[in-house]
Design a protein with these regions (language model features):
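ABC family nucleotide-binding domain
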Residues: 2-216, 221
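Conserved beta-strand-loop-alpha-helix hinge in the C-terminal portion
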Residues: 220-241
């Protein structure tokens, strides 16, 4: 069976000579449909770089990235952009909401770019916002929303439509513990509907929602394990790496 996401011997190098930085070193990772994978590691371990390369926002220096069996390096930039819109949902630390669009317009923009009628797209967008308890703010602009509300809008944009791969970089960073748990529950629910999910987090409580945890250190995968039951077990596992 073809994996939803596969990284084969992926390395990423920034700079050259004395300023050369190895952000990733020969990373191998596969993520299946209906699987939620958490990525943990210290600051600077390559977690965010892994996500941007997996999502075709950066190119690997070495190695292959396959989404649904398609090698991203083998298709044109236009086809890569189309794959990003149709197949991959993103949630990043800085939200990336467009200030001139309302919350629901931000959510539905990828759908409308793919030709979905505005009325249909809005209905889908409102449903996604409702799932995150922020539908009442649908017609507000980003600067009228709190940090937590902007984060939930960004997550709604990532899950709207029929995307098969969800990539989330610290998706609960602006939320309190209750809403953070709600977000992880939503990501978990998405994977149970056939989506493959990868979430970067430094919080063991949230990583314990995953099926599997990948530990990064100095750009390398140092271990992969089935998520232990409970955050205390996960913290102990992390400390041993």
């Amino acid at each position: 069976m073809t994996s939803a996401l596969e990284l084969r011997h992926v390395s990423k190098v920034y700079g050259s000579g004395p300023t050369e930085v190895h952000a990733l070193r020969a990373v191998n990772l596969s993520v299946e449909r209906e699987e939620l994978v958490a990525v943990m590691g210290p600051s600077g371990s390559g977690k965010s770089t892994l996500l941007t390369i997996a999502g075709s926002l950066e190119e690997a220096s070495i190695g292959q990235v396959l989404v649904d069996g398609v090698d991203l390096a083998s298709v044109s930039r236009a086809d890569q952009a189309r794959m990003r819109r149709r197949s991959i949902g993103y949630v990043f630390q800085d939200f990336n909401l467009l200030p001139g669009l309302t919350a629901v317009e931000n959510v539905t923009l990828p759908l409308e770019l793919d030709g979905v009628r505005a009325k249909t797209a809005r209905a889908s967008g409102l449903k996604a916002l409702e799932a995150l308890d922020v539908a009442e703010r649908a017609d507000r602009y980003p600067d009228e929303l709190s940090g937590g509300e902007r984060q939930r809008v960004a997550i709604a944009r990532a899950i709207v439509g029929e995307r098969g791969l969800l990539l989330a970089d610290e998706p609960t960073g602006a939320l309190d513990s209750v809403n953070g748990e709600a977000v992880m529950r939503l990501l978990r629910s998405a994977t149970q509907r056939g989506v493959a999910g990868v979430v970067v987090t430094h919080e063991a409580q949230l990583a314990s929602w995953a099926d599997r945890v990948v530990f990064l250190r100095d750009g390398q995968v140092v271990d992969q394990t089935v998520a232990p039951s409970g955050p205390d077990s996960l913290l102990a596992a992390s400390d041993r790496r």
